[in-house]
Curated annotation (Swiss-Prot):
InterPro entries: MenaQ_synth_MenD, MenD_middle, THDP-binding, Thiamin_PyroP_enz_TPP-bd_dom, TPP_enzyme_TPP-bd. It comes from Salmonella schwarzengrund (strain CVM19633). One of its GO terms (molecular function) is 2-succinyl-5-enolpyruvyl-6-hydroxy-3-cyclohexene-1-carboxylic-acid synthase activity. This is 2-succinyl-5-enolpyruvyl-6-hydroxy-3-cyclohexene-1-carboxylate synthase. Binds 1 thiamine pyrophosphate per subunit. Gene3D superfamilies: 3.40.50.970, TPP-binding domain. Homodimer. Its cofactor is Mg(2+); Mn(2+); thiamine diphosphate. The keyword Manganese applies. Pfam families: TPP_enzyme_C (PF02775), TPP_enzyme_M_2 (PF16582), TPP_enzyme_N (PF02776). Its EC number is 2.2.1.9.
Length: 556
């Protein structure tokens, strides 16, 4: 009997089972213990393979692929700390709903807790963060193949959103020629190998029912808050709110077109807050709200009813309003709850939104970080997509820009970390094959610098704008101690990114004005390659401009 041959047959059943649940992308890191899984994936023609030497980046690459494809993505890593490096992406997926299937190779049980090399306690190591966990036994012909495939099917059927961790122990030897070992065991699955359906099909219904009193609430004064959603959903939500005559407060990730732009500015005006107090119902579609003023208003508003609609399970209202938590796809929910044509009830808010926009436009000529955020819609590639980093840049775009309705926007706004942003953006581009504009800060770029290796081969133009304000300037917006701010919060690195781009053979520009930036972008969009554009800006100008605009708009 060949242990290595049966390991591969066992792994082949696992990987084939994944294809029946829509898995097409498989992300693979190098490793020896994962050989059975890697070879099974490599030999399965249903998969598109992605490789990366850094497991943390690999997990985020899978996250980006899942964001766009809306299908589960598999990740294969070897044993030991390689598994631990998947933790950040796993956490993010749990908060934003992307389906990741983490196939982690492991030592067999007799090598755990006895000093064996590269052997750690992997089973259950992610605690409560995976949506589902599955610890498989060591491959053995004593367990029928139908148990293995039905167990995988059951776990995937239960996976509504987030990550599934499948821990896969394999004994040595891991290498060797294939022979007939386990062939009969494998063939007992019969014509399943030629079929395209799961062995075990389970129906699971999570969608909320139609709210029978909607006809009553849609006649009231309402407010629509739009969080993270798809481009198509964003357009539908904007039309729905317009028909109802309800003000729409759109997040940067809502893709609604933000018909009342600069919400995070005008929500700091007492007149706007007073008018919003008249709302009898607030309907929040989507989660992961960005704006500080929006979150402050959301925490203090007291409508008669506060509804939260999202396809993700769990509580999504940190203010704990009285109301309803409805689990449904946003597009489906809108169809079940049609709008009734009514006149807008807000007067002050549209006026304030227009005045706030004019204040932002008045400052657009200065070459700086805040102005880039305002101008970003002018630089979006046609028929393309935008990936927005975290920290200061996403807040500036949320507060100062107005992105087109239905234009795809992606970000990691679940745990809102700055780790893995370049890797996630790479996954977003690979899954869509669209021209992509990504914008991150300098510390975010440094954090995931080796992900530039993933950007060496792209299928469409990819532009990475690194806003270099020399440190974590988000802390300039917070009451951090002035004497400790630079060393312990901002942590300026005094670096530029030309050498990093050169190391990975990427095109590079460092424009010093808007004309040079526009020229660099024009060239970049003509070539299916990655271009790094570094904008070196005054360190505190972005935060100061935002604070100045907040003060101005609050007194309108």
């Amino acid at each position: 009997m060949s242990v290595s041959a049966f390991n591969r047959r066992w792994a082949a059943v696992i990987l084939e089972a994944l294809t029946r649940h829509g898995v097409r992308h498989v992300c693979i890191a190098p490793g020896s213990r994962s050989t059975p899984l890697t070879l099974a994936a490599a030999e399965n023609p249903a998969f598109i393979h992605h490789t990366h030497f850094d497991e943390r980046g690999l997990g985020h690459l899978a996250l980006g692929l899942a964001k766009v494809s809306q299908q589960p993505v598999a990740v294969i890593v070897t044993s030991g700390t390689a598994v631990a490096n998947l933790y950040p992406a796993l956490i993010e997926a749990g908060l934003t709903g992307e389906k990741l299937i983490l196939l982690t190779a492991d030592r067999p049980p007799e090598l755990i807790d006895c000093g064996a090399n590269q052997a750690i306690r992997q089973a259950g190591m992610f605690s409560s963060h995976p949506s589902q966990t599955l610890s498989l036994p060591r491959p053995t012909q004593d367990i029928p193949a139908r148990w293995l495939v039905s167990t995988i099917d059951n776990a995937l059927a239960m996976l509504h959103a987030g990550a599934l961790h499948i821990n896969c122990p394999f004994a040595e030897p891991l290498y060797g020629d294939m022979n007939d070992t386990g062939l009969v065991w494998q063939q007992r699955l019969g014509d399943w190998w030629q079929d395209e359906k799961p062995w075990l099909r389970e129906a699971r219904r999570l969608a909320s029912d139609k709210q029978r009193d909607w006809f009553f609430w849609r006649q009231k004064r309402g407010v629509v808050v739009a969080g993270r959603m798809s481009a198509e959903e964003g357009k539908k939500v904007a039309q729905w709110a317009q028909t109802l005559g309800w003000p729409l407060i759109g997040d940067v990730l809502s893709q609604t077109g933000q018909p009342l732009p600069c919400a995070d500015l005008w929500l700091g005006n007492a007149k706007a807050v007073t008018e919003l107090q008249q709302a009898q119902i607030v309907v929040q579609l989507g989660s992961s709200l960005t704006g500080k003023r929006l979150l402050q208003w959301q925490a203090t508003c007291e409508p008669e009813e506060y509804w939260v609609i999202d396809n993700i399970e769990g509580r999504l209202d940190p203010a704990h309003h009285r109301g309803r938590r409805l689990i449904a796809k946003i597009a489906d929910w809108l169809e079940m709850h049609p709008a009734e044509k009514r006149k807008p009830w807000c007067v002050e808010i549209p006026r304030l939104a227009e005045l706030a926009w004019q204040r932002v436009v008045a400052q657009r000529d200065t070459f700086g970080e805040a102005q880039l955020a305002h101008r970003i819609r002018d630089y979006l590639p046609e028929q393309g997509q935008l990936f927005v980093g975290n920290s200061l840049v996403v807040r500036l775009i949320d507060a100062l820009s107005q992105l087109p309705a239905g234009y795809p926007v992606y970000s990691n706004r679940g745990a809102s970390g700055i780790d893995g942003l370049l890797s996630t953006a790479a996954g977003v581009q690979r899954a869509s094959a669209k021209s992509t504009l990504a914008i991150v800060g300098d510390l975010s770029a440094l954090y995931d610098l080796n992900a530039l290796a993933l950007l060496r081969q792209v299928s469409a133009p990819f532009v990475l704008i690194v806003v270099n304000n020399n440190g974590g300037q988000i802390f300039s917006l917070l009451p951090t101690p002035q004497s400790k701010r630079e060393r312990f919060y901002l942590m300026p690195q005094n670096v530029h990114f030309d050498h990093a781009a050169a190391m990975f053979n990427l095109r590079y520009h460092r424009p010093e004005n808007w004309e040079e930036l526009e020229s660099a972008l024009a060239g970049a969009w003509r070539t299916p390659a990655t271009t790094v554009i570094e904008l070196v800006v005054n360190d505190t100008d972005g935060a100061q401009t935002l604070q100045q605009l907040l003060a101005q708009v609050s007194h309108l």
